[in-house]
């Protein structure tokens, strides 16, 4: 083989000898001086690294070629380095998990974590036409592909550094453990229901009644929420009726609402949006009070509406022996409003809604905007502590100092206590709606927390984006005890179709796997469905219906998967595969070859080495062996060393000869029979006996 001296290669590449020596050391190639010789393999790698135009072309070409199916990755075997430790070896079908942080997505750092020389990785990929540099940054996808070739599966873990947002959250968790500090907090109420059933009219009636009792004059502006007093106790209403906003808030981890008022018109009954609103509230696990509205209308039927509540939603009224509070009202005339408010206070008392009454405030942003006159504005509902003018605040990646507070009447106030909705002037930028607001001790702390939150958001977006569960992931997830439920939202073109789907899906369930239909409905997939899917980590299934343009945009932003089908058998087939993906894989023992010990070599300080003639199949160092003598099994264990002549190898096929050292076993004799086997994990399948027809 031709040899090239270091200085000769440096001259060829038009770089200094020192630069080349540094490059070689980075690749893990040790050289003593400019006169050191390099073999052709190393020369080719270095030349390849410096041929930038070829590199660009090869990388572009490799982008498609290096994408392998999971099966190909599992079947690929990389030769184990001679000195690789036993615990690093990969058993067929088993993946070793390597936990790394986002900052460790670099080739040299990844190689170090895998305990594989970076020069070997560079060389292995160079032979495939892929040029890698030791210090180059890697995308998560590329890092996973490289790791898989050496028997590893990557898991990205949070960097071990103080998270100031988490610290603020834990601070309140600790305070809540001391029940002696807690007091009753005014409930926050959201009104939901079908369009035209009177949600806005109800909110207006409650608001106007409260104002009339106190003073002349209306509210000068809407800040997104208001509060009323009933028998000396406060109730806060979010003045943005609609379950989309409610669920969007929950999808972002903010639970502002304590109680939901479900409005149902007595002359119309339970409608599709009523079902939708109920499912949103049920998913959030908040108490529901039903307000049967429009009882003043001639064709109103309270009893018929109660019947529909029980049959369609499972909400059985208290006077029917159930546990759902149902209040007949007329938002138009005011009838029943006082009773409804009293029921809200009763439910709040039973729910034991608590807060920390003093100290630094915490709240939830429910509205935000940029005002040309005063700059960023944000409406917050205070959940804990006292918010005052002059406080330093942070909400997500935004921060500031409270310059002014305004109540729902537009009046400036000095402070806000738990349950109060107030508008804040003083943020550096418009904060995200539904962000958690914290009061901190200084402007520097506020800046630090906001900067950390911003950086965290960037890293999360860079790593994986905002993405919820996907159906195909369930098809291969397997083995995760904590994941045995598949959440679905079903939309179809007719009631008959959706009912047929629900019945068919129910037959797919077993003791091990479960499908939870979070919501079902008729018609186009809309933005409300997407927000519910985001909140409940569900997949949306459309049967003979499609998403509207807003839903498609929203799904892309939220990372929610929408699957649309025209044939019910295709839908059921995908669900079967998804459910099978939830099952623990089955480990099987597979015999892959046989051999016979023809010679035994006794080596001092090493032990007995078997000279083996392979009779059929193959032997792999990562597998196992059973040894039989006179048809009796005398050993079943691992292979410590596998050699072909003097070379350590990972696999040998019949009819070749090889040398084998058995792990912790030396009692071998000529004529012993060997049976080689491997352990594989195989996907389990479910035997479904459902019968379904296309609706």
From Swiss-Prot:
For this entry, the protein name equals Translation initiation factor IF-2
Residue ranges for the region (G3) are: 239-242
Where do the segments described as G2 lie?
Answer: 218-222
* Annotated positions binding GTP: 193-200, 239-243, 293-296
Main location per the UniProt record:
cytoplasm
Membership in a protein family: Belongs to the TRAFAC class translation factor GTPase superfamily. Classic translation factor GTPase family. IF-2 subfamily.
tr-type G domain location is 184-358
User: Which organism's genome codes for this protein?
Assistant: Kosmotoga olearia (strain ATCC BAA-1733 / DSM 21960 / TBF 19.5.1)
One term under GO cellular component: cytosol
- Read off the lineage from the record: Bacteria, Thermotogati, Thermotogota, Thermotogae, Kosmotogales
Region G1: start-end pairs? 193-200
One Pfam family assigned to this protein is GTP_EFTU
Q: Which UniProt keywords apply?
A: Cytoplasm, GTP-binding, Initiation factor, Nucleotide-binding, Protein biosynthesis
Note down the stretches annotated as region G4.
293-296
**Positions of the UniProt region annotated as Disordered:** 60-92
A Gene Ontology molecular function term of the record: translation initiation factor activity
The gene for this chain is infB
The annotated region (G5) lies at: 330-332
Question: What does this chain do?
Answer: One of the essential components for the initiation of protein synthesis. Protects formylmethionyl-tRNA from spontaneous hydrolysis and promotes its binding to the 30S ribosomal subunits. Also involved in the hydrolysis of GTP during the formation of the 70S ribosomal complex.
The UniProt entry, under InterPro entries, shows: EF-G-like_DII, IF2_II, IF2_N, P-loop_NTPase, Small_GTP-bd, T_Tr_GTP-bd_dom, TF_IF2_bacterial-like, TIF_IF2
Q: Quick check: keyword Metal-binding in the entry?
A: no
Q: List the subcellular locations.
A: Cytoplasm
């Amino acid at each position: 083989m031709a040899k090239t001296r270091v200085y000769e290669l440096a001259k060829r590449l038009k770089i200094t000898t020192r630069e080349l020596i540094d490059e070689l050391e980075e690749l893990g190639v040790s050289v003593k001086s400019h006169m050191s010789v390099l073999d052709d393999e190393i020369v080719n790698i270095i030349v390849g690294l410096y041929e930038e135009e070829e590199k660009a072309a090869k990388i572009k070409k490799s982008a498609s070629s290096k994408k392998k199916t999971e099966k190909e990755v599992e079947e690929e075997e990389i030769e184990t380095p001679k000195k690789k430790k036993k615990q690093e070896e990969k058993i067929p079908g088993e993946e070793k998990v390597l936990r790394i942080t986002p900052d460790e997505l670099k080739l040299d750092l990844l190689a170090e974590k895998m305990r594989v020389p970076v020069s070997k990785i560079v060389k292995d990929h160079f032979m495939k036409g892929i040029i890698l540099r030791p210090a180059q940054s890697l995308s998560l996808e590329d890092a996973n592909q490289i790791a898989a070739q050496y028997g590893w599966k990557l898991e990205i873990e949070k960097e071990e550094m103080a998270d100031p947002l988490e610290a603020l959250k834990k601070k309140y968790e600790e305070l809540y453990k001391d029940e002696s500090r807690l007091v009753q907090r005014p409930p926050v109420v959201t009104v939901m229901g079908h369009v035209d059933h009177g949600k806005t009219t109800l909110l207006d009636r409650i608001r106007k009644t409260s104002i009339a009792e106190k003073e002349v004059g209306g509210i000068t502006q809407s800040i997104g929420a208001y509060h009323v007093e009933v028998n000396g106790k406060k109730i806060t209403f979010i003045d943005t009726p609609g379950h989309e906003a409610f669920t969007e808030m929950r999808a972002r981890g903010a639970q502002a609402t304590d109680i939901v008022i479900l409005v149902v018109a007595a002359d119309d009954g339970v409608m599709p949006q009523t079902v939708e609103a109920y499912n949103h509230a049920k998913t959030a696990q908040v108490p529901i009070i039903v307000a049967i509205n429009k009882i003043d209308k001639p064709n109103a039927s309270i009893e018929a509406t109660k019947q529909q509540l029980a049959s369609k939603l499972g909400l059985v009224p208290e006077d029917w022996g159930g546990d759902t509070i149902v209040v007949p009202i007329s938002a138009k005339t005011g009838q029943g409003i006082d009773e409804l408010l009293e029921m809200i206070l009763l439910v709040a008392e039973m729910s034991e809604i608590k807060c920390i009454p003093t100290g630094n405030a915490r709240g939830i942003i429910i509205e935000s905007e940029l005002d040309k006159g005063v700059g960023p504005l944000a409406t917050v509902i205070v959940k804990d502590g006292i918010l005052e003018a002059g406080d330093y605040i942070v909400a997500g990646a935004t921060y500031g100092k409270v310059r002014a507070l305004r109540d729902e009447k537009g009046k400036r106030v000095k402070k806000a206590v738990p349950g109060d909705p107030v508008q804040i002037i003083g943020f550096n930028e418009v904060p995200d709606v539904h962000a958690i607001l914290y009061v901190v001790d200084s402007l520097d702390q506020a800046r630090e927390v906001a900067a950390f939150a911003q950086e965290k958001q960037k890293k999360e977006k860079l790593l994986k984006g905002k993405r919820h569960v996907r159906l195909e992931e369930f098809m291969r997830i397997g083995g995760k005890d904590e994941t045995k439920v598949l959440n679905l939202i079903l939309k179809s073109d007719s009631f008959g179709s959706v009912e047929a789907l629900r019945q068919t899906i129910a037959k797919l369930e077993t003791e091990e796997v479960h499908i939870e239909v979070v919501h079902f409905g008729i018609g186009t997939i809309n933005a409300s469905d997407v927000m519910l899917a985001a909140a409940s980590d569900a997949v949306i299934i459309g049967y003979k219906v499609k998403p509207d343009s807003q839903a498609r945009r929203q799904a892309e932003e939220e990372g929610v998967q929408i699957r649309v089908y025209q044939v019910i058998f295709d839908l059921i087939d995908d669900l079967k595969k998804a459910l099978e993906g939830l099952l623990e894989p089955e480990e099987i023992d597979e015999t892959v070859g046989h051999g016979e010990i023809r010679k035994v070599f006794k080596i001092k300080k090493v032990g007995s080495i078997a000279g083996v003639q392979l009779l059929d199949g193959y032997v792999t160092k990562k597998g196992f062996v059973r040894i039989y003598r006179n048809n009796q099994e005398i050993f079943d264990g691992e292979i410590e060393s596998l050699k072909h002549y003097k070379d350590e190898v990972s696999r040998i096929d019949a009819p070749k000869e090889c040398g084998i050292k058995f792990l912790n076993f030396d009692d071998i004799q000529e004529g012993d029979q060997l049976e080689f086997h491997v352990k594989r994990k195989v996907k389990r399948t479910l035997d479904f006996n459902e019968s379904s027809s296309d609706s």
